[in-house]
């Protein structure tokens, strides 16, 4: 099963995206024999939406990072082979998601990690 992170033109990690990712990982474990995690067309992800984070309470920020941690653990503990497909940069939490994959494959060229 392929899971593609798509969140606008900057592909930022948001609470909604992370909750959808968590659900998709759980669904993949029940319906497929492998998992491919992909980012956007130009880059994997710009990481956490800092503008959002600056406008939130510490409780909301903590909840979002707990959700990110949940996704990371799901990827690490997934019984399926998990592959991270990297095109372009992967910043912050996005890099953590890729590091939780069993295998990572990147496109040729220079990238920012």
Regions found by a protein language model. Name each.
Residues 19-20, 31, 39-71, 90:
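Glycine- (often His-adjacent) and acidic-residue-rich active-site loop
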Residues 1-38, 73, 77:
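Conserved CoA-thioester-binding segment of acyl-CoA-metabolizing enzymes
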Residues 11, 42, 111:
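Glycine-centered loop/turn positions within well-structured domains
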Residues 12, 45, 93:
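Residues that form or flank phosphate/diphosphate-binding pockets in enzymes
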Residues 35-39, 82-85:
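Short beta-strand segments at enzyme active-site cores
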Residues 37, 49, 97-99:
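Hydrophobic/aromatic residues within transmembrane alpha-helices
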Residues 72-113:
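Glycine-rich beta-to-alpha active-site loop
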């Amino acid at each position: 099963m392929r899971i593609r992170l798509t969140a606008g033109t900057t592909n930022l990690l948001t609470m909604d995206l992370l909750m959808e990712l968590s659900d998709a990982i759980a669904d993949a474990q029940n319906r497929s024999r492998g998992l491919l995690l992909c980012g956007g067309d130009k880059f994997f992800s710009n990481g956490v939406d800092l503008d959002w984070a600056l406008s939130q309470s510490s409780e909301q920020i903590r909840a979002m990072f707990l959700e990110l941690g949940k996704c990371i653990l799901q990827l690490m503990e997934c019984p399926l082979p998990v592959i991270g497909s990297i095109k372009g940069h992967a910043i912050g939490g996005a890099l953590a998601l890729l590091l939780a994959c069993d295998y990572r494959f990147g496109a040729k060229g220079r990238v920012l990690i």
